[in-house]
From Swiss-Prot:
Residues 1-56 form the HTH lysR-type domain. PROSITE patterns: HTH_LYSR. It comes from Rhizobium radiobacter. This is HTH-type transcriptional regulator GbpR. PANTHER family: HTH-TYPE TRANSCRIPTIONAL REGULATOR YBHD (PTHR30419), NITROGEN ASSIMILATION TRANSCRIPTIONAL ACTIVATOR-RELATED (PTHR30419:SF8). It holds the Pfam family HTH_1.
């Protein structure tokens, strides 16, 4: 198992020395371990690059990096579940979600899971769908809730449509747009905007809104994937931002200095619960993740 961990660390850090440090061993020991793996497969698994090392085509062809992650994850979970069987409690789940379902679906499921599985370990990553899809294929999650990235083959996933993500435009309390006068999309384009990075689905959706209405895109744009920074900018400037409706309602419920402008373009995007496609005999989700996914689905359709 140490050999597999070493390969994963080399892929992540791009340097044998950094991989060795991550595993608390010396670089000569790490190099020797790499040589042992290459002797086993009778092919070089790494090669020097401009900065450190990268996997060779043999390493990629064997999919050792991804398979190693899967094997390590399964071994880790098997060990944990054996311990939990002995203690009569627990379970674990690794889930990724985009912002809206993280608030509306994952949080309620967490509450229910903690009641049903005393001692359960819940690991949640909130990120963009592109990042989550890559993480899922790397065996870092049991399932994710997000959109289907355009540049991913849907055949790589088991996909279950579970809901619609709604978004809205938000500004701070006291914003000039909140004076009660009729507001048009043209009025909004003159303000600063906070967008997700180019290519993000919500960003593309807003670009389509401007294009459909024949209105030029705002000139002053701040790009950030951070929801926290987006809200901070909205609450402290005259900027406008499109965010998930669930997030807007959550923040408004915390009495933050944020409100919807008189013009509110509702945006609907679908999001799905995805699990990585597995070989026929690989089995389905473990009990805790399976229940967690069912609870998310039940909340979505309720």
């Amino acid at each position: 198992m140490s050999h597999l961990r070493m390969l994963v660390m080399i892929e992540e850090h791009g340097q044998v020395s950094a991989a060795a440090a991550a595993m608390n061993m010396t670089q000569p020991a790490a190099s020797r371990m790499l040589s042992e793996m290459e002797a086993i497969v009778k092919s070089p698994l790494c090669q020097r690059a401009s900065r450190g090392v990268v996997l060779t085509k043999f390493g990629e062809a064997l999919a050792l990096a991804r398979r190693a992650r899967t094997i390590l994850l399964e071994l880790r979970e098997a060990s944990r579940e054996l311990n939990q069987m002995k203690s009569g409690s627990g379970g674990s789940v690794y889930i990724g979600a985009v912002t809206a379902p993280a608030i509306s679906l994952v949080v309620p499921a967490i509450r229910r899971a903690m009641d049903t599985y005393p001692g359960i370990e819940i690991n949640v990553q909130v990120e963009s769908s592109n990042v989550l899809a890559r993480e899922l294929l790397a065996a870092r999650h049991d399932f994710i809730i997000g959109r289907i990235p355009d540049d991913f083959d849907p055949g790589l996933f088991s996909i279950h449509e579970i809901g619609i993500e709604r978004a809205c435009l938000v500004v701070r309390e006291g914003h000039p747009l909140m004076r009660g006068e009729p507001v048009t999309l043209q009025d909004l384009s003159g303000y600063d905007w906070v967008f997700q990075p180019p290519g993000a689905l919500l960003r593309r959706t807003m670009e389509d809104v401007f294009l459909t209405h024949g209105v030029a895109m705002p000139r002053n744009v701040i790009n950030t994937p951070s929801v926290v920074l987006t809200l901070a900018l909205v609450c402290n400037t005259n900027a406008i931002a499109p965010i998930a409706q669930d997030m807007a309602e959550f923040v408004a419920g915390q009495q933050a200095d944020m409100a919807e402008p008189a013009f509110c373009q509702r945006i609907s995007n679908s999001w799905s619960s995805l699990t990585a496609s597995l070989p026929p005999k690989a089995g389905s989700c473990r009990p805790a993740p399976a229940c967690f996914m069912i609870w998310c689905w039940m909340k979505a359709v309720s």
